[in-house]
Curated annotation (Swiss-Prot):
SMART domains: Elp3 (SM00729). Induction: Part of the lepA-hemN operon; there is a strong transcriptional terminator between the 2 genes, this gene is much less transcribed. There can be further readthough downstream. Induced under anaerobic conditions by resDE, fnr and arfM. It is found in: Cytoplasm. Keywords: 4Fe-4S, Chaperone, Cytoplasm, Heme, Iron, Iron-sulfur, Metal-binding, S-adenosyl-L-methionine. This is Heme chaperone HemW. S-adenosyl-L-methionine 2 binds at G61, T62, Q121, R133, D158. Transmembrane segments: none annotated. PROSITE patterns: RADICAL_SAM (PS51918). Might carry two S-adenosyl-L-methionine binding sites with only one binding to the iron-sulfur cluster. One of its GO terms (biological process) is porphyrin-containing compound biosynthetic process. [4Fe-4S] cluster binds at C11, C15, C18. It comes from Bacillus subtilis (strain 168). S-adenosyl-L-methionine 1 binds at Y5, G60, E94.
Length: 379
């Protein structure tokens, strides 16, 4: 096992678009949660053996919503239990610009964290307020500069497009401002309105006014062209990086490789079995105490399912799915398994089917879901 994801489900506030497993941190049993999280790690490793991890990613929620003492407790626990060695190439933490003090940054740096992912979303203060964010544009500059001063040389900025009230001009301003910071990595996602969110409730009432689909496609084109013009290469549908600064942890997912998933609501992929942990914090703590593991669901992945996942995850990468690696992994030819699908998608101009790989065309990136769905139920 080369990768571990750790979920911290606490936030100081809830964003209007977020459907991740998260809770207001006030009145939550945070220390009990951290104790249960440590126990889950210990119990899992007792079963699988000590891993030689290459990547660790702490997400949420908002990991940096923890107090300085709690953040240090988390870092100490990870280093004590997971025992990352010099082979660990990426130790990443998601952070909010408004709660990232110099002291918290020092705690992360001293613990071995070498990559930060800032939830920026937009550099328009009025849009930030509309989507339920509490930070301002100036907070991003302050936190970014502070992180640089403390020695972080790998910073990613998360941005969004297709937001309510967002214009092409807004987006261009946000992308230009983000690029002016000269970060190593940029994730730029289109808004997807998910159930159980503030935006979903507004949409149900006819009160959410989003850019039309054609404009959203134009926004994505702007993102791609500006990144390319700035020398930031696209390596996945929504991700852009300087050479060599791609997210190694996320490439684990897109390459359909296995990983630990620790914490409330976390997903894991261990020994050919996909696991989903319970989401509610109290339920998670109780299950760890009673059973040692917090699984809500486990599913042994069939070979057919693995192959489907290989295609719809792998095609998210600009490099696509390697035919050589596919054959080594599954003992079968990619062209032999999907002859009609590959022919149809190539004729529609959505994929390139070369001798070595299958990958999306420019048009395929715009219609990715159509491409991914074509491989489902074909085996």
């Amino acid at each position: 096992m080369k990768s571990a994801y750790i979920h911290i489900p606490f936030c100081e506030h809830i964003c209007h678009y977020c459907d991740f497993n998260k809770y207001f941190i006030q009145s939550q049993p945070v220390d009990e949660y951290l104790n249960a999280l440590e126990q889950e790690m210990i119990n899992t490793i007792a079963k699988t053996g000590q891993p030689d991890l290459k990547t660790i990613f702490i997400g949420g929620g908002t990991p940096t919503s923890l107090s300085e003492e709690q953040l240090k407790k988390l870092m100490d626990m990870i280093n004590r239990v997971l025992k990352p060695s010099s082979d660990l190439s990426e130790f990443a933490v998601e952070a909010n610009p408004d709660d990232l003090s110099a002291e918290k940054l020092k705690i992360l740096k001293e613990a071995g964290v070498n990559r930060l992912s800032f939830g920026v979303q937009t550099f328009e203060d009025d849009l930030l307020e509309k989507i339920g964010r509490v930070h301002k544009q100036k907070d991003v500059f302050t936190s970014f500069e502070r992180a640089r001063e403390i020695g972080f040389e790998n910073i990613s900025l998360d941005l969004m497009f297709g937001l309510p009230g967002q214009t092409l001009k807004h987006l261009e301003h946000s992308i230009n401002t983000a690029l002016s910071l000269d970060a190593e990595h940029y994730s730029v996602y289109s808004l997807i309105v998910e159930p159980k969110t503030v935006f979903y409730n507004l949409m149900q009432k006819g009160r959410l006014h989003l850019p039309p689909q054609e404009q959203e496609a134009e926004m994505y084109e702007i993102v791609m062209s500006k990144m390319e013009a700035h020398g930031i290469h696209q390596y996945e549908i929504s991700n852009f990086a300087k050479a060599g600064m791609e997210s190694k942890h996320n490439l684990t997912y897109w390459s359909n490789e296995q990983y630990f998933g620790f914490g409330a609501g976390a997903h894991g992929y261990i020994g050919g079995t996909r696991t989903v942990n319970v989401g509610p914090v109290k339920h998670y703590i109780d299950l760890i105490a009673e059973k040692g593991f917090p699984y809500r669901d486990t599913h042994e992945v069939t070979t057919e399912e693995q192959i489907e996942e290989e295609m719809f995850l792998g095609l998210r990468k600009t490099a696509g799915v390697s035919k050589k690696r596919f054959a080594e992994k599954y003992g079968r030819s990619l062209d032999g398994l999907f002859p009609s699908v590959l022919k149809d998608l190539a004729e529609k101009g959505l994929i390139h089917n070369s001798e070595s790989a299958v990958y999306l065309t420019h048009q395929g990136k715009l219609l990715g879901n159509e491409v991914f769905g074509a491989f489902l139920g074909e085996l």
